[in-house]
Amino acid sequence: MRAPTRDDPYYRIDWQRVRDAIGARTRLLMLNFPHNPTGAVLDESDLDALESIVRETGVLLLSDEVYEHIVFDGKPHASLSRRPLLAEHAFVISSFGKTYHTTGWKVGYCCAPRQLSAELRKVHQFMVFTVSSPMQFALAEYMANPKPYLDLPAFYQAKRDRLAAGLANTRFRPLPSPGTFFMLADYSEITKHAEADFARHLTIDHGVTVIPVSAFYQNPAAPESNHHLVRFCFAKQDATLDAAIERLAHV
């Protein structure tokens, strides 16, 4: 089952809608926060609502938190692992690649209670053939120093603010990005073309590549999946961001 987020307020979860969707066959809820592609994050009220659902239904949770260290404006990441009840029911997934700029290494981890972890390993052994041992040793040594990941929010927030300020001087309308290194932008003042078509136009005619948000929907081509939104990635050198902004000013 799916429980669509609400775009007003900004991509928030309607927890009553989630609760209403849970039936007798529901075993697990999957969450992704900080959220790709919207950049939305959870707050304490979300954890309160989720606790209430878990307490009532006993449903298990799979929480994709790979952007856990990329949250902005001084707000902490609201991890499910911070609440004992949620932690008892959760598989919390994260990524060394996102945290340490090593996405090509494909090294991540899962935190779960012993009983859940044992079940996960039964599946994992058939899904993953091998992970590079040298890279795991390198990460184990590097993560002993917390400074690199503690500095991530300020590092990426500066880039987020740079892109947002630049887009403000274009016909794009940047949306809030409280987490991740992605930002959505509304292009409805430019054209009403479908998102995939507009993304293709930007790449071919302006040399700036974006992702159509409709690509993340169950049926990307459906009219209800197109909201004139594209996703920018600001995990780039400042010079690259500035060059992109200059090109987008002419769109």
Give the positions of each predicted feature:
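PLP-dependent class I/II
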Residues: 1-251
